[in-house]
A protein has these predicted regions:
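Amphipathic alpha-helical interaction segments
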Residues: 35, 50-54, 84
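Positively charged, aromatic-accented nucleic-acid-binding surfaces
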Residues: 1-34, 61-96
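Key DNA-contact positions within bacterial/archaeal DNA-binding proteins
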Residues: 37-41
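Short Lys/Arg-enriched helix C-cap and helix-to-coil transition segments
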Residues: 51-65
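DNA major-groove recognition helix of helix-turn-helix
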Residues: 43, 47
Length: 96
């Protein structure tokens, strides 16, 4: 699965990949400059409130070396960015 990762520089420049965005919780926490537990909490709340559905926004992928992990769609990344309050999230919201 080819997947893109959004990057946000310190000065607020957002780089959007040309391939579909699918990011892990760790990649989102790095991009938005928050702890992983903040991302996990936001994902859990989004699913609990039925704002988005897991079947539409999460995929389970396995690397060639056998390591597997969950990745989340652009729709989830955007929803999380509107829940968190960091300068990186604000830059991403302006970009969207």
């Amino acid at each position: 699965m080819e997947r893109g990762i959004i990057t946000i520089t310190e000065n607020g420049t957002v780089t959007m990949p040309t391939v579909p965005v699918w990011m892990t919780q760790q990649e989102m926490s790095d991009a938005f400059n928050v702890f992983g537990c903040d991302i996990r909490r936001a994902v859990h709340a989004i699913y609990k409130n039925m704002e988005l559905f897991e079947s539409d926004t999460m995929r389970y992928i396995r690397q060639d070396n056998g390591i597997s992990y969950d990745v989340y769609s652009l729709e989830m990344v955007i929803t999380i960015a509107f829940r968190l309050r960091t300068k990186e999230c604000m830059a991403f919201r302006r970009f969207v």
